[in-house]
Structures are given as structure tokens and as C-alpha cells.
Amino acid sequence: MKKNTHPEYRQVLFVDSSTGYKFVCGSTYQTDKTEVFEGQEYPVCYVSVSSSSHPFFTGSKKLVDAEGRVDKFLKRYSGVKQMAPKPETSVEEVLPKGKKKAPAKKKK
């Protein structure tokens, strides 16, 4: 078997950035940031939503996402000007060179 194929499994400190709630859980998350929690130093991972802030677990109907998809879309494309509609042009059938169009069949 190959050696060193699996990532290192260790205790990682997860911090909910919206509530400040901290918890330790086993993970393979890789980071250089560390933080002291309950007297021990752990690698730290900042999360935007956890069980302490998600509406399903808290029972509240507060808006968790500070900037949603629609807001991001409007922010990105608010300065874009609308394009003028293109005028319709007639479409001609293009045949390869040397080929002639078959004559139309007569209806009976």
C-alpha cells in the first residue's frame, strides 16, 4: 500500500462567524491559523452558518445570509447598459459549391 495517501485527521476548532459560537470536531481541514480554546491550541476554521445560527436549528426566521444570490447579481450587473435589439435580417439558404437545390415537387 502507498504511504501518506490519507489526509491527517485531527481535532479542529470551528467558529461560527455570525454568532461567535465555537466547537471542536474531528476533521481533515487544512489550515495554518490556530486559536486557543479551553486551554488547548487547535487549527481553526471559520464558518458562516452552523447549528447555532441556522434557522432550522434555532427556530427563528431571521435572515442568515447577509448578502444573498439576488443581491450579488444586482450588485454585479447594476451598471451594465441594456443592449439595443438587433434588427431582423433576411436569412438566405447557403448551399455547398457544386450542389444545386432540388426542384420542388408538384402536388397531385
From Swiss-Prot:
Q: Which InterPro entries match?
A: Ribosomal_bL28/bL31-like_sf (IPR034704), Ribosomal_bL31 (IPR002150), Ribosomal_bL31_B (IPR027493), Ribosomal_bL31_sf (IPR042105)
- The yes or no answer to whether the keyword Ribosomal protein is present is yes
- One Pfam family of this protein, by short name? Ribosomal_L31
- Composition bias, Basic residues: 97-108
- Please list the GO terms describing molecular function: structural constituent of ribosome
Q: Which PROSITE patterns does this entry report, sorted A to Z? A: RIBOSOMAL_L31
Q: Which GO terms describe its cellular component?
A: ribonucleoprotein complex; ribosome
Stretch list, region Disordered: 85-108
Q: What are the alphabetically sorted keywords of the record? A: Ribonucleoprotein, Ribosomal protein
In its keyword annotation, does this UniProt entry include Ribonucleoprotein? yes
Q: Which biological processes are named by the entry's GO terms?
A: translation
In terms of SUPFAM superfamilies, this protein maps to:
L28p-like
Assembly information from the UniProt record: Part of the 50S ribosomal subunit.
* Family to which this protein belongs: Belongs to the bacterial ribosomal protein bL31 family. Type B subfamily.
Record-given protein name = Large ribosomal subunit protein bL31B
